[in-house]
Amino acid sequence: LVHPIALADYRDFRPVITGACASFGHPLPRDVPPSAEALAWLGLPAPDRGEPIRDGVIRGSSGWAAARTGGGAVSVFVRAGSYTSRPGQIDPLQLDVRFGSREVVTDAGTFSYNSPPPWRNALASGAVHNGPILDDEEPGIRGPRFLWYVWPSARIVSAEMEGEEAVIVAEIPDRVRRTVRVMADRVIVRDEVLAPNAWRARIRWLLHPNADPSSVRVEGGSRLVEAREGEPAGWFSPTYGERAASRYVEVEREVTPGMRIVTEILGFASKGRFHSQGE
């Protein structure tokens, strides 16, 4: 294992950002506190301070897009890659949502490659990610160990700001399209089935263990499912070898022409009306 350069939480990336900025002479955004521990381990002076992180959208050539709105109040990350080397997980159209520093909708993580069934690489399947699943068919086919028979494939169609809102469109070609609208206090997700012969669509929104289930609302109704021992769905792994019971919001629909599944993700518990049009 790599020796940690700070005692921060595993998912706290400030030490890495500090170390990278100090090592490569890049200004550290002034709204990111520098990690004194990282600098001490690396024996480097503190980097210069730069402009604060601003709202906006960025996308990567490997098939991902990230957006930030509301002065950091809301941030999302969308995965929609086409692979040139072996995939790690089946996660096309996976969406992660944070409100400030709080995770609400999250990725399941890894947990373990080698544990006894059902935990041997169990969190790699599409069924435990929140990309839409059509007709119970995984968007990729795994073989034994790290072998793949069919690689998952998706793409970012567009990622741009529309005024103060960010809009990311991603799709599994000829299967499903996901449109993510990021506002200052909520995220609206519209999933549209493209496959002409599909008959059923399912989405499972895994919640962070600390997230309020009422933060995720699906137009037309959904059900909340608690994690159960022996079943991978509903579990969250913050780091390798660790797992915690959580819950997921599940929606299943019979596919009809022009059907869309609309989900609203909030940074607060709400019993108000559903804002399906991003009002």
Language model segments and positions:
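Carbohydrate-active enzyme catalytic cores, enriched for enzymes
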Residues: L1-V104, A159-G163
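Catalytic Cys-His active-site segments of thiol-dependent hydrolases/isopeptidases
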Residues: V105-T110
